[in-house]
């Protein structure tokens, strides 16, 4: 997993735009929060493009996160906790 520590990172900026309706419509993407919700989305046939993981989630749910990373068609990024909290 690649670590993102700067809010200037293009992937992080793109994710932040998804907080607004306009950003979601322009990009035709949504944010899904939580390992359980990501799993439900995948079971429903939604392709996960990017997975963001925080250090606290990684520490608490390492097996679930590892499984999700392996099943994700896109990329997985480890976010610094302050950035993850902003998402």
Where in this protein do the model-derived segments appear?
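Glycine/small-residue-rich loop that forms an oxyanion/phosphate-binding "nest" at active or ligand-binding sites
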Residues: 65-87
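Boundary-proximal intrinsically disordered activation/regulatory segments immediately upstream
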Residues: 1-64, 71
């Amino acid at each position: 997993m690649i670590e993102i520590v700067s809010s200037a990172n293009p992937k992080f900026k793109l994710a932040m735009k998804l907080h607004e309706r306009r950003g979601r419509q322009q990009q035709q993407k949504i944010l899904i929060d939580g390992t359980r919700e990501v799993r439900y989305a995948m079971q429903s046939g939604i392709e996960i493009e990017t997975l963001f993981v925080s250090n606290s989630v990684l520490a608490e749910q390492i097996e679930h996160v590892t499984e999700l990373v392996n099943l994700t068609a896109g990329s997985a990024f480890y976010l610094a906790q302050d950035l993850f909290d902003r998402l």
